[in-house]
Amino acid sequence: MIRQVLLYIFFSHLIFAKGSELSRAKNTHSGNKIRSTFYNYGLVGRWSSEPEDIGGEWPINSGHEYIGDVGHLVGSEFQNLDGQLKKSVTTVYGPRGSEMNQDIHWGWEPLSGYTNPDTPLVAMSHMGPNEDDPDYIHTWPNSWPDTASDPIDPGWPGSWNGYFGKNQKNAEQESYFVMDDYNDAEFNYFPDSLNLERRGMGLECAIRGLQWNHILAEDVLFWLYDIKNISNKNIDKMVFGYIVGTITGGDGDSQDDWADFDKIDDIAFSYDNGTDLESGLGGIGASGWSPVGLAGYAFLESPGNPYDGIDNDGDASFGSGNTITTQMFEPVIFSPGDTVVIIDYTTYERTLIAFPSDSLTITKGNDIFVFKPNQPIEEIARNLFDDNLNGIIDENNGASIEITPGFFEDYYLYIDSESGVGLKYIDYYSGIGSDNLLIDESRLDGVDNDGDWDITKDDVGLDGLAGSNDFGENDGIPTSGVGTDLPGEPNIDKTDIDESDQIGLSSFYYFNFGVGPQMNDDNRLWDEMLPGYFNNSIQNTDADFLFSSGYFPLLREQTERFSIALLFGDNLPDLLRNKQTVQTIYNQNYNFAKAPDLPKVWAFAGDGYVTLYWDD
C-alpha cells in the first residue's frame, strides 16, 4: 500500500504539473551586499507599479540601484506541423513587454506546489517553519513535488529542498522555484504527443538563487537554471540568453550608460558615463552620489555541448587528443571506398564506414543530407551538423566583433588568435582523444569525469545528506542523481559544475532602449542571439544589453544547466577579480567556509549589571 501511495503522488505530479499565473509569487534576496526583488516566473528586478520592489541594489540599504529588470531567454529552432522551420524564444513576463494572447502569457509561468500557498512569497531557505516565532513568515510548501519519488521520505516534508541536498543550507540565502512553457500556444506545434494540451517547446526550468556573506562572495548573487526537455521530441538547436535593463547610476541617470564585455571571463557589464574603468572614479549617480560602481552579469556555467567532439571549455589540455588547426576547415573529396565518419544524431554515436559508390544519405531530425562521391565538401559553421564527415561538429565556428560601427574583427573560436594553438578534439579515425574524459564531458553520463569525488567526504548517498542511510551511502562508489529527481552525491554530475563542456559567452548585443528587440518578436530575438556576433558600437546612452550562449542540442528528457552571476565591483579590475574569484568558488562547488549561525542572545538585568546568555 505504501508503494502504491508513493507511485500515485509521483505520477500525479507528472500528469497535472503545469505553469500558471495563479501561482505567481515574489521575494527578495538580501543575504549579502546585494539586495534585489525576484519573481518565480523568472523576472529579476522590479516593476514600477510595485513601489517596494528593488532592482539590483548595491551596497545593500544604500538606495543605489543598478538593474531595472532582467530576464532569461531560451531559443529553440523546430519544425511545425506544416513542415516550416520556426524559431521560438521563450521569455519572462516583465515590464519591457511580454508575448500575450489576450490575458494569457505565452512564456514562462510558475508551477504550483513550490511555495506555501498561505503566503505570496517564493520559498527561501531562511524562511522555513519556526514554531518559536508565531509572526515568522513560513514560505516552504508542505512537501516538494520534485522529491515525491524519494522512497525513504517522499516529498521531504519539513525539510529544505536544497541544491546541496536534503536540508542542506550551505548558503546564507537560497531560493527555489520551478516553471514551464506549458501555455505558450503561439505556434502550430505540440511537443508531447501524449498530452496535446501542452504547448510551448516542452521545457521545464528549475531556478535557484544563492547568496553568501563570505568576504569572497559578498558582492555576488548566483542564479542557477536547470532547463529540462520534458517533451518526447529532441530539440536540435537551442540558445540561452539574458536580457538586462540597466539603470547604472539609478533612476534619472540611466540615459548615459555604457556597456562592454570580456570574452575571456564570459562577462558583460555596464557602467556610468564619466567613469574611469581603472580607478572607478568619475561617475555620478542620479542624486549626486559618487563614485558609481560597475554591474556585471557573467556566465559561471554556460550551456555545454557534449556531442561535438571538441573540448569547448579548454579543460582537457593535459590529456590525450590532437588540436584543431585551420587545415581541418579546407574542402575534402571522398571517393568510393574511402573511410568516413557518420553520426547517429539520435544518440550522437560515431561509426566508421566506407563511402558508398553512389551516394551517402544522413538523416538529422526532419533534415536529409545527401553526399555524392568525388564532390568537394567542407564544414559549415553553426549548423550543428558534421558536413565534412570527420565526426567533428562545427570545428570552424568563428566570431565577429563590431568594434566601431561597420568595423569588425574576425577570429576562430577554437583556435587561440595569438598562439595559433587550437583546442583538443577526438580523432574518430585513430581514436586519439577518446580516452580523455574532459573532451565532451557531461553532467548526465554517470561518470566522475574530473576525478574529484572523495570517498572520505562525498559518499553520502542519493539525497546528498549524510546519515540518512539511503541508496548509495557508504557503498564506496560515486552515486549520481542523473535519472532521478534527487541531487546525488557531491562532485558527480548534477552536483559537479566542471563536468560540463561549456560553450561560454557567444554573443553580445548593446542596443538603445525602445528600439531593441521586443519580447513578442521571436525571430528578432533569435537573430540578436546569433552566436559569434558581438556588438557594443553604441555608448553613452539609455541602452540595454542581451548576451547569450549557444548553439547546443537538448535531447528529450535531458537537462542543460546554466549559472549566471550578478556581481559588482568598484572598478573594472575589481569586477574582473570578483568574477575570477567566484568562478573558482563555483568550480569548487561553493567549497568555502560559511559564517556560523547567529546564536540566540538574551539578557538578565541585575543591580548595576547585565548578564548575557547565548546558546551554542
Where are these regions (language model features)?
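Extracellular/surface-associated beta-sandwich interaction domains
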Residues: 17-616
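Bacterial Sec-dependent N-terminal signal peptides
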Residues: 1-21
